[in-house]
Design a protein with these regions (language model features):
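Active-site beta-loop-alpha junctions enriched in small/polar residues
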Residues: 170, 285-287
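Catalytic residues for metal-mediated phosphoryl-transfer on nucleic acids/nucleotides
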Residues: 205-284, 305, 323-463, 467, ...
């Protein structure tokens, strides 16, 4: 009986929430309740008819003012009921598929969402359009606000400015049962959708790890806004596990590989003309220096201002033939050239000229190799576009292009990449340096939480007892072994200031310093005499 009461209360509270958020109407209560029962494989309990027939209007307050509503917890109650009813797998992904199915049923259909969005865009209010759409995606649980709030964030002062650090705890850990099922699955058919960025994900029910094609998340509550970039249809959505404010994604309607070229730059410029309050950028289109998904052409953007955008200006340059474009070398660990112009066409042409020149540029004195004997190309760029005013604030009439020069050459000494995080930093970061990290925001793995916690305990023990064998303790601890050399160095430099209250903050600061070194590893022109001379040779060629 208690379970039945919990289901009724959870369903009715969720419906009240959906009405409050204008996802459904007051007269939808009975339909919505029965739809939730269907989703969880139930035929009861009966709803409260006094509640169902309420006629008073709920005040449409700001989305964050509905007191104490726990969307994640409410969906968990309903998902548990679905598991008990045999309507969902007893796994984390099984529960999530039910939760997304419920929220998808309570959301407006894509055509309604598009009409509402375009109505706001039609009166030249792109900020109002994205505010409304972002609010809907949060309210519907597609943007996982509760999960994102669990991320650990801080900033670290460095020679490059304040770098932003995030330990990403928002993405769910893989359930061991899902992992086992994936190992036993047979993938015999065509994979649909081809990847998680395809626009065909809109409304997709998801599938388990044991299913043909393997695990795929449920996307019933995903809504994708059709937009036009360079005359093609693209999709616009928000990221479910956002790394920064209003983290959005634009993805090609065609499942095709990433490419950084004139067409891609045109798409980026079209995007900021649609949404001048957002920046937009593309991962590089080569392995090692690209993102985790190279198979689907897409961009990432949002409302955040990254550390790179506040980097100190070092010197100015011009690009021959483009007198309306000003170029700036930024003091940034990666090699970034910034272009500015009121003239969109000139900025596009100048940026394309730099990209084409860089793709063919070889300077063996600094290890840059454009092509190897096997014909493989190694040079590309990570481009970022935004519009600013004369003070650098987002949304103005000046176009800005940031071009981070990248090279994915490998050597025997650096088999994962010469301009990739070096081995001595892999205990903190060994993954590719993609678009977000290029701009100065580290996305670090959740393993660091227990590992840094264990390192903290050993450092405090060594501080308390001069006879404590710190080196042996670190090497003998599975959580700390990879950090041993780094932790010993931190202790040698900072033991005097170390306390129980500040130990984790000190470790966080030192992690930020390592991230700065990692970005420096990724820079093709180092900040030494040889690197400065090499960069100037490239700029002079323009």
């Amino acid at each position: 009986m208690a379970v039945m009461t919990d289901v009724r209360e959870a369903a009715q509270n969720l419906i009240e929430y959906a009405i409050h958020r204008s996802m459904i109407g007051h007269d939808d209560r009975i339909w919505a309740y029965n739809t939730i029962l269907e989703c969880i494989g139930a035929t009861g309990p009966a709803l409260d008819m006094a509640w169902a027939l309420k006629t008073e209007k709920i005040s449409l307050l700001h989305p964050d003012t509905l007191p104490d509503f726990d969307l994640e917890g409410t969906l968990a109650v309903l998902s548990e009921a679905a598991v008990a009813n045999g309507a969902a797998e007893d796994t984390a992904s099984g529960r999530d598929r039910i939760a997304m199915r419920i929220m998808g049923a309570l959301m407006p259909r894509p055509s309604v969402v598009n009409e509402e969005f375009n109505g706001r865009m039609g009166v030249n209010e792109p900020r109002a359009a994205t505010d409304w759409f972002y609010g809907l995606c949060c309210d519907a649980g597609y943007v996982r606000r509760a999960a994102i709030a669990r991320n650990i964030k801080w900033s670290t002062p460095t020679n490059w400015g304040d770098l932003e650090i995030t330990i990403n705890l928002s993405k769910p850990e893989k359930d061991p049962r899902d992992i086992a099922a994936a190992g036993a699955a047979k993938n015999t058919g065509e994979k649909y959708p081809a990847c998680q960025l395809c626009i065909e994900n809109e409304g997709y029910p998801g599938r388990s790890a044991a299913a043909d094609g393997g695990a795929h998340p449920a996307r019933q509550n995903l809504r994708v806004i059709p937009i036009k970039l360079d005359g093609e249809r693209w999709g616009f959505q928000y990221s479910p596990y956002a790394y920064f404010n209003e983290h959005c994604i634009a993805m090609s309607s065609e499942h095709r590989p990433m490419h950084v070229d004139r067409k891609g730059l045109t798409c980026l410029l079209d995007f900021v003309d649609l949404f001048p309050h957002y920046f937009i950028g593309s991962n590089a289109d080569l392995p090692i220096v690209g993102g985790s998904i190279l198979s689907h052409d897409h961009f990432q953007g949002g409302a955040h201002e990254f550390p790179m955008m506040h980097a100190t200006e070092v010197s100015q340059f011009s690009v021959t033939g483009f007198d309306q474009v000003s170029g700036t070398v930024l003091q940034w660990p990666l090699s970034v050239l910034r272009l500015r112009s009121h003239d969109r066409a000139q900025l596009l042409d100048a940026a394309e000229k730099i990209i084409l020149a860089w793709r063919e540029w070889t300077d063996e004195s600094v290890g840059v190799i454009a092509h190897t004997a096997d014909g493989a190309a190694h040079n590309t760029v990570t481009p970022v576009i935004r519009r600013v005013d004369s003070r650098g604030n987002a949304g103005g009439e000046i176009y800005e292009a940031y071009l981070a020069l990248r090279c994915n050459i490998t050597t025997d000494e650096h088999p994962l990449g010469v301009f990739h995080p070096h081995a001595e930093h892999h205990h903190i970061k060994k993954e590719n340096i993609g678009l977000i990290e290029v701009m100065g925001l580290a996305i670090l793995p959740p393993r660091l939480v227990p590992e840094l916690g264990a390192v903290r305990e050993h450092l405090l023990a060594a501080k308390a007892d001069a006879s404590y064998d710190l080196a042996s303790a670190l090497e003998g601890d599975d959580l700390c072994r990879s950090h041993a050399a780094w932790a010993k160095d931190v202790f040698a430099r900072r033991a005097d200031e170390l306390t129980a209250d500040n130990a984790i903050d000190i470790l966080h600061e030192e992690v930020g310093v390592v991230f700065g070194h990692v970005l420096d590893n990724a820079g093709v022109f180092k900040w030494d005499e040889a690197g400065r001379a090499a960069q100037q040779r490239f700029i002079d060629s323009l």
